[in-house]
Protein backbone atom coordinates (compact mmCIF):
# COMPACT_ATOMS: atom_id res chain seq x y z
CA UNK A 1 0.00 0.00 0.00
CA UNK A 2 1.28 3.51 -0.72
CA UNK A 3 2.39 5.45 2.35
CA UNK A 4 0.33 8.54 1.58
CA UNK A 5 -2.84 6.88 0.32
CA UNK A 6 -6.38 7.66 1.39
CA UNK A 7 -8.68 5.25 3.21
CA UNK A 8 -10.73 4.83 0.03
CA UNK A 9 -7.61 3.97 -2.00
CA UNK A 10 -6.54 1.44 0.63
CA UNK A 11 -10.03 -0.09 0.73
CA UNK A 12 -10.13 -0.43 -3.07
CA UNK A 13 -6.68 -2.01 -3.22
CA UNK A 14 -7.37 -4.42 -0.36
CA UNK A 15 -10.79 -5.40 -1.71
CA UNK A 16 -9.27 -6.15 -5.11
CA UNK A 17 -6.41 -8.11 -3.53
CA UNK A 18 -8.63 -10.30 -1.34
CA UNK A 19 -11.10 -10.84 -4.20
CA UNK A 20 -8.29 -12.01 -6.50
CA UNK A 21 -6.60 -14.07 -3.73
CA UNK A 22 -9.38 -15.60 -1.60
CA UNK A 23 -7.05 -18.23 -0.10
CA UNK A 24 -4.80 -15.68 1.62
CA UNK A 25 -5.25 -16.00 5.37
CA UNK A 26 -1.98 -14.65 6.80
CA UNK A 27 -0.46 -11.21 6.24
CA UNK A 28 2.44 -9.20 7.58
CA UNK A 29 2.87 -5.46 7.55
CA UNK A 30 6.41 -4.12 7.64
CA UNK A 31 5.62 -0.73 9.10
CA UNK A 32 3.50 0.87 11.78
CA UNK A 33 0.31 0.91 9.69
CA UNK A 34 -1.06 -2.57 10.39
CA UNK A 35 -4.21 -0.82 11.56
CA UNK A 36 -5.04 0.14 7.95
CA UNK A 37 -5.48 -3.51 7.09
CA UNK A 38 -6.96 -4.30 10.51
CA UNK A 39 -9.68 -1.66 10.11
CA UNK A 40 -10.45 -2.95 6.61
CA UNK A 41 -10.80 -6.52 7.86
CA UNK A 42 -13.15 -5.41 10.64
CA UNK A 43 -15.34 -3.35 8.31
CA UNK A 44 -15.54 -6.14 5.72
CA UNK A 45 -16.01 -8.90 8.32
CA UNK A 46 -13.01 -10.92 7.12
CA UNK A 47 -12.32 -12.76 10.38
CA UNK A 48 -10.35 -15.57 8.73
CA UNK A 49 -7.32 -13.36 7.94
CA UNK A 50 -4.55 -13.02 10.52
CA UNK A 51 -2.20 -10.04 10.57
CA UNK A 52 1.19 -9.62 12.16
CA UNK A 53 2.27 -6.02 12.48
CA UNK A 54 4.98 -3.80 13.88
CA UNK A 55 4.96 -1.02 16.43
CA UNK A 56 2.80 -0.35 19.42
CA UNK A 57 0.93 2.72 18.21
CA UNK A 58 -2.57 3.54 19.47
CA UNK A 59 -4.47 2.47 16.33
CA UNK A 60 -2.56 -0.81 16.10
CA UNK A 61 -3.31 -1.54 19.77
CA UNK A 62 -7.03 -0.91 19.18
CA UNK A 63 -7.09 -3.38 16.28
CA UNK A 64 -5.15 -5.89 18.37
CA UNK A 65 -7.73 -5.63 21.16
CA UNK A 66 -10.59 -5.99 18.64
CA UNK A 67 -8.98 -9.08 17.10
CA UNK A 68 -8.27 -7.84 13.59
CA UNK A 69 -4.52 -7.93 14.30
CA UNK A 70 -3.19 -11.21 15.71
CA UNK A 71 -0.01 -9.84 17.23
CA UNK A 72 2.37 -6.91 17.14
CA UNK A 73 6.12 -6.74 17.42
CA UNK A 74 6.99 -3.90 19.78
CA UNK A 75 10.45 -2.44 19.37
CA UNK A 76 12.33 -0.16 21.73
CA UNK A 77 13.11 2.77 19.45
CA UNK A 78 14.72 4.89 22.18
CA UNK A 79 17.18 2.14 23.05
CA UNK A 80 17.88 1.41 19.38
CA UNK A 81 18.65 5.07 18.73
CA UNK A 82 20.77 5.45 21.85
CA UNK A 83 22.85 2.35 21.10
CA UNK A 84 23.36 3.46 17.49
CA UNK A 85 24.63 6.91 18.47
CA UNK A 86 26.76 5.39 21.25
CA UNK A 87 28.38 2.94 18.81
CA UNK A 88 28.99 5.72 16.30
CA UNK A 89 30.62 7.89 18.98
CA UNK A 90 32.86 5.05 20.15
CA UNK A 91 33.94 4.23 16.60
CA UNK A 92 34.45 7.75 15.23
CA UNK A 93 35.50 9.83 18.23
CA UNK A 94 37.13 7.30 20.54
CA UNK A 95 38.48 5.14 17.67
CA UNK A 96 37.36 2.00 19.48
CA UNK A 97 36.48 -1.24 17.78
CA UNK A 98 32.75 -1.90 18.00
CA UNK A 99 30.62 -4.99 17.52
CA UNK A 100 29.37 -5.26 13.92
CA UNK A 101 26.02 -6.62 15.15
CA UNK A 102 24.12 -5.40 18.19
CA UNK A 103 20.94 -7.28 19.01
CA UNK A 104 18.02 -5.34 20.45
CA UNK A 105 15.05 -6.68 22.40
CA UNK A 106 11.56 -6.94 20.97
CA UNK A 107 8.30 -7.90 22.59
CA UNK A 108 5.42 -9.86 21.09
CA UNK A 109 2.08 -8.34 21.97
CA UNK A 110 -1.17 -10.27 21.76
CA UNK A 111 -4.77 -9.40 22.62
CA UNK A 112 -4.17 -11.18 25.93
CA UNK A 113 -1.11 -9.19 27.03
CA UNK A 114 -1.42 -5.81 25.27
CA UNK A 115 -3.08 -4.15 28.27
CA UNK A 116 -0.08 -5.07 30.43
CA UNK A 117 2.56 -3.73 28.05
CA UNK A 118 4.53 -0.85 29.41
CA UNK A 119 6.93 0.90 27.12
CA UNK A 120 10.07 1.28 29.16
CA UNK A 121 13.61 2.32 28.51
CA UNK A 122 15.70 -0.80 28.96
Locations of regions flagged by a protein language model:
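Short, well-structured alpha-helical segments in soluble
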Residues: 9-23
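Venus flytrap/periplasmic-binding-protein-like
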Residues: 29-32, 42-70, 110
Amino acid sequence: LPIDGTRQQYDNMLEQFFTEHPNIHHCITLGSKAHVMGDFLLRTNRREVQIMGYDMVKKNAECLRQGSISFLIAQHAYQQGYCSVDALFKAVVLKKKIQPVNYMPIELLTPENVNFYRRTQL
